[in-house]
Structures are given as C-alpha cells and as structure tokens.
Amino acid sequence: MEPSLLMWRFFVFIVVPGCVTEACHDDPPSLRNAMFKVLRYEVGTMINCDCKAGFRRVSAVMRCVGDSSHSAWNNRCFCNSTSPAKNPVKPVTPGSEEQRERKPTDAQSQTQPPEQADLPGHCEEPPPWEHEREPLKRVYHFTLGQTVHYQCAQGFRALHTGPAESTCTMIHGEMRWTRPRLKCISEGANSQAPDEAEPPESTEAPPGSGTFLTTRMAGTTDFQKPTDVVATLDTFIFTTEYQIAVAGCILLLSSILLLSCLTWQRRWKKNRRTI
C-alpha cells in the first residue's frame, strides 16, 4: 500500500475525530442566590473519575455514549488503593439516582425541579463510586446542546422574566451558554417593578462562584486538580484554538490529497512509459 494511503487512513481515524469534537468550554452562568441542576446529560458528556487521597483511579473519565434509541455511561469509575496491602475496590455500574445539587454552598431550593424522564439519547446522573473524592464536586465536560435548569435557593423566591434555564449553543460561530432569565430575591423583599430593567447576569463563572467545574483554564474541558498524572480524553476546544485546529485539519487534509494525486500521477506516467 502506498505511503500516502497509509497517511490518509491515519488522518481519517486519528486526527479528524479530535478536530470535530464539540464541547462547551465555559461554565454555565452563575446566578446570585440560585443554583442549577442537570436533569439529563447529552451524549458525549464526560465525568472525571476522581478518587480520595490514597487511591488511584483506573479510568480517567466516564463518557455518556449511545444514539437516539439507547444511551448509557460506557465506563466504570473505580479506585484502587495505592497501598499494596489493600484489595482493589469493586466497581460500581453507572445507573440512575436522585439528582443532586450542583452547588452545596447554596441551600436546597424549596421549589421542586422538573420531573426527570428517561429519554433516549441522554444519560442520567451516575451513582457515587466507592472512594470517590467528592461526589458533590464532580467535574463535568458538557457538550453542545446541554441544558441546565436554575432554581432559587431556600429563603429566596423567583421573579421569572423568561425561561430559568441555560443551554450550550452555537452563537456567532462560538459555543456559549444562553443567559437564564431568572432573578431571585428574599422572600420578605418587595417584588421588582415590572418596568425596572434587570441587570444582565454574567455568562462566566467568577472565582469562588461555587460551580464545581473548576479548571486550570477558563472552561469545563480541563480536569480539577488530578491526584495522578493520567493521559485523559480532554477536549481542548476554545474559541481561537478551535478555529486554528479546524484550519490545521483542513490544511493537512489538502496536503494529503495533493500528495496522493502526485503519487498516483507519477505511477501512471511510469506505467505508460513501460507500455
């Protein structure tokens, strides 16, 4: 087989999938006196398999995989003790459980979230695995199309001016979270006047905001203080970097096609001379 064809196959199966990955690179918006829930996870969502001190994760991440007819977490998170005297723990099969709050620093809301449904193409919250580092501080890598639902914390009530949810979507060529139209005020406070303009909420989580998708860089595509150095399935998709990666993929594809054409033309001319 020609070297150019080998390079082409390597490009298609290795390089291209990494270039087209669609991941949300920002945290969901942070609202004052409110918290958000994730009722269902889109296919492609990843969760870091983090372990307590003294334990080492076997798998780096757990990924939601499937299609419109069936979806499930394709991996098991479990932790092995770093001490040879201890036996490895038994893995926990991912499954559904009651949804937890993403911000334990905020009190539990008195408003019940929308009822969770088992829909194809989505994964539910997996249960904690044994020796998990902090079940309430899991690091998620959301994908395009993910929606989170907001509700006011206990002691606050909502002034709805629109949908109390945020969705990761493509806006002007960039993946961004839509702004939830929710304002939470104290239960004893007077309602806001209808004509009073509500200040826009930031779509970026400020430092110490309580969202547990903290990263080394701004975004949800990095890991939260890993306890061991493991090659992971990070999706390094940021606005500028994503465009550069796509341009690089196109350039590499063009170069390989050109090399293939030149090789085929050279072989064709050589065969004609021999005839």
Swiss-Prot record:
Q: Which organism is it from?
A: Ovis aries (Sheep)
Q: Which PANTHER family match?
A: INTERLEUKIN-2 RECEPTOR ALPHA CHAIN, INTERLEUKIN-2 RECEPTOR SUBUNIT ALPHA
> What are the glycosylated positions?
N80
Protein's name in the database: Interleukin-2 receptor subunit alpha
Extracellular face: residue ranges? Answer: 22-243
Give all residue intervals belonging to the Sushi domain.
22-81, 121-186
GO CC field: membrane
Topology of this chain in the membrane: Single-pass type I membrane protein
Source domain of life is Eukaryota
Q: How does it assemble?
A: Non-covalent dimer of an alpha and a beta subunit. IL2R exists in 3 different forms: a high affinity dimer, an intermediate affinity monomer (beta subunit), and a low affinity monomer (alpha subunit). The high and intermediate affinity forms also associate with a gamma subunit.
Q: Could you tell me which Pfam families the record lists for this protein?
A: Sushi
Swiss-Prot/TrEMBL keywords: Disulfide bond, Glycoprotein, Immunity, Membrane, Receptor, Repeat, Signal, Sushi, Transmembrane, Transmembrane helix
Whether Transmembrane helix counts among this entry's keywords is: yes
